[in-house]
Amino acid sequence: AVDAGAKVIHLLADLHGRGADGSFVSDLFKEAHMILIEQGRRETVTLFGGGGIVGADHVPKAIISGLDAAALDLPVLFAFQGRSHGSLRKRDKVSGTLPRRMDHDWAEQRLANLCGSWRDQLLEILGAMGIRDVRRLRGEFGRSMIVRHLEDEAFEGIAGYAGGGA
């Protein structure tokens, strides 16, 4: 896509945060980020990603994994008190419905509240890391704490621990 002149690439996982091969979304984002770095093209392409991003803490994790921006789909639907229907495993099998009578001003305020609270969470995490600009967070893998890695480090060598990605 980059060879064809794409300036934005939208990476999409299922709504549980899994790629087509079952890989977790943060691994997929990191892989795309690293490929672009290896090609010397990272600064020419915007990585936009979605899938499994449902909590305020998921946005900074997605950015640490290499994204420039995160797509929000289900959180917006639910902020409007909408309902999802179908399988969340397959994007083409899920749909959403909004309340029949939704006041425009109310919906606008709900979206502002959602974005504001997620912004506050991002600023809190940036502050805790001593970072003032969200762009500095992109691809900072060394700052991330991945549960799988932490468990392996803590429990490796203990009889009965099934870790190691098992």
Feature roles, as predicted:
Residues 1-108:
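Glycine-rich phosphate/ribose-binding loops and adjacent secondary-structure elements
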